[in-house]
């Protein structure tokens, strides 16, 4: 009995309820388990095959590996699959053919011709038969897998439409679409039984072979409403559920707890819980006008083997992995049950062994120069200087092609047939004749992890420990619990499986704005940082036990990384331009990097390499690395970056991945920055954060709020997961292998009661001798003597089994879901959907109803759906924040409550802090502290209180409120508090302005801005703008000066014009008339007067001798006169006698004889004049303009001197 119990417990445990700590997985085939109490199968993941138009496609349940298997399958396709054969069978109604193809799309072939009016088909995978129904003829026909031995199984039926088979129970089911009935019969064609009848229409039938239930789609006669119904194999326990798709259902298939179905109008595949219709996921395929057709889920558990296998042990030799016959090289004949050897092997004489055939020894290999035998095969070889041609048989001498000829990925050889591409050893040429594939080629032989060479032309794929090779024999999937995503959604934290299932909210209350998030696999806790509340928290994976770790010195934390081995966490603060570190409990926090860092955002830690990696989105964007202490900094990338945001590490390959939000690119490189390349660009929206696991890179998109993934090597196979998201930020993959090296047994013994052992990152519990493991896989039950003597029976009446947990939890889950908004994830294989032309706001969700789509603003936003604005809940008075002890902070799409100064709590429940008892006051030694609500008061000791009195040796802190003999304190710091440490950037000094109740920064030279955030280019741009204003002023001033000069020139021109006009009237002397006027006013003047000179002219007054008797001196040599006096040696113009009309000047005679001129002897100076008159006594008399000058008068009375005035 004890043995039976031990065997049954794992079987029962597979029905346990799925939670975050025990994610859901498919049941295990043939009882093979892997892992601990939350075990899952070691086997392939399920995938879907479906008909669409005249083609057959396949796609994973996660939306990946979407490919076309059959191109021309026919217009109307009815299909099923045979898992053991790895084949798809379908009926082409147009050509009346039964055809088949392998699951990978290869070797399409015809099976047999088939009659018209086939309405349904199913595969009997145990008896190796194909069964189909003919609605017009009212018959069901059966044939073998090769199309032979066809015969009618059932006849005289009422319009048999859909067919389903359970060969394990040996039942065949079909529906009558016209009559609305369901029937059952044995596979032998006997025992026909009507299960139920309905007045409505039945369109599709499918079986749940594990739970032994029949499912069908039921329509009302108007076709306006569709339901999914089920019953047991006897027609009892009928269950009806309405799936909220608002579309008519067409085809369906079941697997595990999920139901997959398609609709008529929508080009989508829906996934939902088969019991409740909830946990819905929609796979949105490429836009098409043709609806989806048949739909099947492919997995070995969908076609289980019969349990009553009665073969003898000697007839099962081919099933053994060890022994007489290896399962890797032999199969089993269905008739004789004896071993059959694979190609390249021959059966041994005792017919129990498969022996290798040496093809090289029989000379039937076809190699031209060399042959080498391998187990089950062989390959051709070539000597040095020769290369193996693409046919794998012939060798050719190596003659390289010209460079302009070769387009080969490896190298090219010239042959008589022309240039041919060839590949290195370990690779082969692809079908395009240019690309190489293999372990020695860049594609790694198509293997997602390990490529193992078997020969120079063959290889096989393998996986790292903890990963399983999938059905395609190339990709690897992590074993153990099903991985899922955690992501910060700005105002909450959500979780979701890779296929969109289990989509829900983990934390939503008092979140504010959360961009930073990470997971600790050892204690199974999440760490996250608030940018609105400005602190860092942690909580359990179920959202309980929230703890504040860092509350002081945090401003804008946008990146966070947990060192799960070193037991620390690191964060980036973009507001304070630093990187901090702390123990996981929040103790011993310190700043490790602050110098030469501008705006750090994303951060990742590599515990094995002991390195930190982060992105900097500042003026000089770059990717940097340092030791865990902040030393040994290294720039990974600095070119071609604009706004590098998220960063992550692939620990399997030691590759670094990051995203650039402004360039919309995903890039990768080695840990040292080498071999950098772009993985994808232009189709990733606005990526914010990035994560990597298995074969895919995940990243969050703000442009179309969603989570996306692409292949981590090629950048292809893009899939989008969306569903009522706001701003998905940090991404974390939760799985034991996502962070290798973690030891869950270090924390609380891994949850095990007795013994804990680490197995691939998970805790494996076992019990000591005398105990047995309970159903939870962690606790141990004592086996006392009474139990052993009684046969080891254990009373499980009071034990809570997983089935009890399932039922109770589902009831509570249903109650919660009814009161909350149900999140529905959508897998977008293509961005072309019905919502694309609507243009919804990024803060709205699209609701598709048939061919119409509308936009609805998300919670916390208001608008018409195309334009949604944030609702200020604080202004509207919606929040529940207690006004006396907390304040409301509005955030994007929500709000948070934060306790006021003097209080502590979660923002909604705030308690007063006793500053006096804690010593957090500044009353001084001569004052006593009294705690008050939200603050404290200081009272002077030993003296009477007076208004305005301050205690001696005590300085009142800021924000004091004087009230007679005491003052009340709200904030005892005179400078900026610790919460604003680092508020001012680039060495700026923080100041608190009490009058304005605001903080300000005193910036150093070269930095400006509210927080001294502008420098270098930004600062110079502002300065350049100021210089530009100055230059504008200078330009205006110059223009004014030019205008003034032009005005002066115009005046001068006018004056010049007037002078020329006077000259034209009196060309000899224009000033003669004025001279006459002067002479008429001077009667003492001589009658003849003086000969006037035109203006300008010279008035020359020099020292001279009085030449009596009219005698003229004779000039001597070297400018001396006849009397020895000096004569001028240079003149502007030769002196001329007066009266000759010269325009440059004239000589003025001053002798007793008329017309004679004085003798010039010495210095001269220029001065304007308008005429002269002769004075008596031999001295010139100046013009009235000159005589008015006292200096001139003095000089005029001095006989020995004369003056020369020149213009």
From Swiss-Prot:
Q: Can you cite a GO biological process for this protein?
A: positive regulation of mitotic nuclear division
Record keywords, A-Z? Disease variant, Disulfide bond, EGF-like domain, Glycoprotein, Growth factor, Membrane, Primary hypomagnesemia, Repeat, Signal, Transmembrane, Transmembrane helix
Short name of one Pfam family? EGF
What InterPro entries does this protein's entry cite? Answer: 6-blade_b-propeller_TolB-like (IPR011042), Cueball_EGF_LRP_Nidogen (IPR050778), EGF-like_Ca-bd_dom (IPR001881), EGF-like_dom (IPR000742), EGF-type_Asp/Asn_hydroxyl_site (IPR000152), EGF_Ca-bd_CS (IPR018097), Growth_fac_rcpt_cys_sf (IPR009030), LDLR_classB_rpt (IPR000033)
Q: Which residues lie on this side of the membrane: Extracellular?
A: 23-1032
GO CC annotations? clathrin-coated endocytic vesicle membrane; extracellular exosome; extracellular region; extracellular space; lysosomal membrane; plasma membrane; platelet alpha granule lumen
Query: Which residue ranges does the record annotate as region O-glycosylated at one site?
Result: 801-807
- Name one molecular function that GO assigns to this entry: transmembrane receptor protein tyrosine kinase activator activity
* Transmembrane regions: 1033-1053
- Note the topology in the membrane: Single-pass type I membrane protein
The ranges of the LDL-receptor class B repeats are 86-127, 128-169, 170-211, 212-258, 483-523, 524-566, 567-609, 610-653, 654-696
Q: Where in the cell is it found?
A: Membrane
Please describe the organ and tissue distribution of this protein's expression.
Expressed in kidney, salivary gland, cerebrum and prostate.
According to the record, glycans are attached at: 38, 104, 117, 148, 324, 404, 596, 815, 926
* Maturation and modification: O-glycosylated with core 1-like and core 2-like glycans. It is uncertain if Ser-954 or Thr-955 is O-glycosylated. The modification here shows glycan heterogeneity: HexHexNAc (major) and Hex2HexNAc2 (minor).
Q: Where is the composition biased (Basic and acidic residues)?
A: 1070-1085
> Which residue stretches are annotated as topological domain Cytoplasmic?
1054-1207
Signal peptide location: 1-22
Disulfide pairs here are 318-330, 325-339, 341-354, 360-371, 367-380, 382-395, 401-412, 408-421, 423-436, 439-451, 447-461, 463-476, 745-756, 752-765, 767-780, 835-846, 840-855, 857-868, 874-888, 881-897, 899-910, 916-929, 923-938, 940-951, 976-990, 984-1001, 1003-1012
What function does this protein fulfil?
EGF stimulates the growth of various epidermal and epithelial tissues in vivo and in vitro and of some fibroblasts in cell culture. Magnesiotropic hormone that stimulates magnesium reabsorption in the renal distal convoluted tubule via engagement of EGFR and activation of the magnesium channel TRPM6. Can induce neurite outgrowth in motoneurons of the pond snail Lymnaea stagnalis in vitro.
**Quaternary structure and partners:** Interacts with EGFR and promotes EGFR dimerization. Interacts with RHBDF2. Interacts with RHBDF1; may retain EGF in the endoplasmic reticulum and regulates its degradation through the endoplasmic reticulum-associated degradation (ERAD).
Disorder cited: Hypomagnesemia 4: A disorder characterized by massive renal hypomagnesemia and normal levels of serum calcium and calcium excretion. Clinical features include seizures, mild-to moderate psychomotor retardation, and brisk tendon reflexes.
The name this protein goes by in its record? Pro-epidermal growth factor
Source organism per UniProt: Homo sapiens (Human)
Its gene? EGF
